[in-house]
Each structure stands twice: as C-alpha cells, then as structure tokens.
C-alpha cells in the first residue's frame, strides 16, 4: 500500500474569451445621451414657439441677472414686474419701449445726409476726371447747407456763363450742366434751380424786362440743359429768378461773382416745405403768406446807359 503510486491529477484552466456583448453595449449609452439631448432641444424649441413675446423677454431678463441677485432675491433692476427673481429692465412698460425705440426720423436724416455727402464726392470725382470740367473748377462752388447740397455755377468777368444780357447758355456752361445731369439723376432727391444777377439794371430788351425776368430765364435755360443731359424732367421741383436779392460776395453788388446759377439738391425737409407752400388740404387751402406790395416796374435808365448783364 505504501508503495502504491498516487494518481496524478492534472487540472487544465482554460481562459474564457470575453463575449462581444460587453464591448457592443457602449453605443447604447452614447445613443441614449444623444436622444436625451435631442429631446431637450426640441422641448426648448417647442417652449419658445408657444411663449408670448412678453414671456420671452422675461426669460431673457432672467439669464442676464447676476447669480447672487437671483439666489438671494435682492432688488430687481428698474423694479421690473418680471415673475423671475432678480429681473432686469422691464421692457413691457410703455415708458421703457419709448426710450428703447430708435428715432426713425433721425435715422432717415442721417441716411439722407450720407447720401448727399456721397453725391458731393461723386461730383468732385467727376470734375477731377474730366479735363474740361477741371478747367472750370473755379466756377463751381459745392457745399452742404441746411436745405441740402448746393451746387453754384459762378460767373466771372473773363468767362461769363451766359451771353451778356441774355439767357443764351455759353458752351462751357452747357458742358457743366450736361455732365452733372446723370449724377443728379441717380439719387431720389428733387432739385430747385435759382438764377441770380448782379445789381446792374437791365438796359436792353422790352420795357419792363428786368433782372427778375433775366434771372428766371437763365434758371429755366439751365433746366433745359440739364434735361438735355439726361436729367429726368420730373426731378425739377422749382425754377425761380432771384435777380440781385441774394448776394454771394461782400465786394459789392455789381461783382461778377453774384451772377450765378444755384442748383440745390433738396433734402426731404426742404422738399416738404416747398410743397407745403402750394399745397391744399381736402377742406380748405393752406393759408397764404402775406406778400409785400408789388414794386413798380423797373424803368429803363436814360443816362448814363447801364451795362447789360
């Protein structure tokens, strides 16, 4: 018995390969997270779609509120009526809406001012690019005034813009007017034309024909040249003759610089003022301003004979 050999027991330990189910289960977690996020997203979108503008403002106000104020329930900004603690400005109040609302009229004025400034730049560029107009630059005065953009074509002793004592346009005046016409036609603003003369009495022509008629005829002749250059005839709102009533120079009423054509690109306010002068309401006409007594017709000077302009 003692010599009997004990049986040898061999234990084989097999390594169990992991099944694929454990690795494949991770996508379920990611998918569940994705579905949760999508559900939250669509829930937020649905809440936004059914909320009123007032509720949306209050929600936005809540998220702008400092955390400490929201938690402690401190004083709310501007004593808002928002039901959310710590709310900010109450945009639902009428007074607040008036303060926050932009001034539409002021924005329109700024846009119009910007358009007129651009027009001024375009005209300067046009003059510099054309040798003929560049040579006539001393006869052009462009500036911004309260009524809009003013373009003045000024006469000179050596180079008049019109025939002496006549409304016949000189060739270089025609070049200026026809060159700027397309530029003026490219903006919505309307135009006022005014003719000016010096203080010399008009000596030629029919009796009663004075600097008033001459300045008006020259302004109308300028209008015709603008239309011939491509300007829409409907853009001209007014053509007037001012005679020698508005001097441009302090050097004297007979200075050649006072003989000019003033072309005014009107802003909206100036245009409405001109239209209001001749407008009529449905019930009664607009009150007419009292006109001064008519001056006697200008007599033809006898001695010495005045120089025609």
Swiss-Prot record:
Residues 1-28 are cytoplasmic. The chain crosses the membrane at residues 29-50. InterPro entries: Bact_OuterMem_StrucFunc (IPR050330), MotB-like_N_dom (IPR025713), OmpA-like (IPR006665), OmpA-like_sf (IPR036737). Residues 276-309 are annotated as: Disordered. One of its GO terms (biological process) is bacterial-type flagellum-dependent cell motility. The keyword Cell inner membrane applies. It is found in: Cell inner membrane. SUPFAM superfamilies: OmpA-like. Keywords: Cell inner membrane, Cell membrane, Chemotaxis, Flagellar rotation, Membrane, Transmembrane, Transmembrane helix. Its main location: membrane. Residues 149-269 form the OmpA-like domain. Residues 300-309 have a biased composition (Low complexity). Residues 51-309 are periplasmic. It is a single-pass type II membrane protein. It comes from the Bacteria. PANTHER family: MOTILITY PROTEIN B, STATOR ELEMENT OF FLAGELLAR MOTOR COMPLEX. Each stator complex is composed of 4 MotA and 2 MotB subunits. 2 A subunits and 1 B subunit are thought to form a single ion channel, so that each stator complex contains two channels. Belongs to the MotB family. This is Motility protein B.
